[in-house]
């Protein structure tokens, strides 16, 4: 089963950062939302190997961390990053800054 485990996108910017590239790449996944308003939950620990969201299972790959998910999606949908190397470097720098 292909799935993306996230927290509520409005509450968890990390989840939103994982969800966006998956949607932009057009990956067919079941999105499983775990409510995070009350803080970390046992449900996250049960559903993900790292105990964090976002977490992606896709075609045999298991990927956690929003930036790793974005890179995985970009490998499947190369148009996610700019084609020009200078623009791509700037985009990756911005993504890394948001990730830090």
List each language-model region with its residue ranges.
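GST-like domain detector, emphasizing the conserved glutathione-binding G-site
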Residues: 1-100
């Amino acid at each position: 089963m292909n799935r993306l485990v996230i927290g509520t996108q409005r509450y968890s910017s990390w989840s939103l950062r994982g969800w966006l590239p998956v949607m932009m790449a057009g990956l067919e996944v079941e999105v499983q939302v775990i409510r995070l308003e009350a803080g970390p939950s046992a449900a996250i620990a049960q559903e993900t190997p790292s105990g964090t969201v976002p977490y992606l299972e896709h075609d045999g790959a298991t990927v956690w961390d929003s930036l790793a998910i974005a890179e995985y999606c970009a490998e499947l949908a190369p148009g996610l990053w700019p084609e020009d190397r200078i623009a791509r470097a700037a985009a990756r720098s911005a993504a890394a800054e948001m990730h830090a």
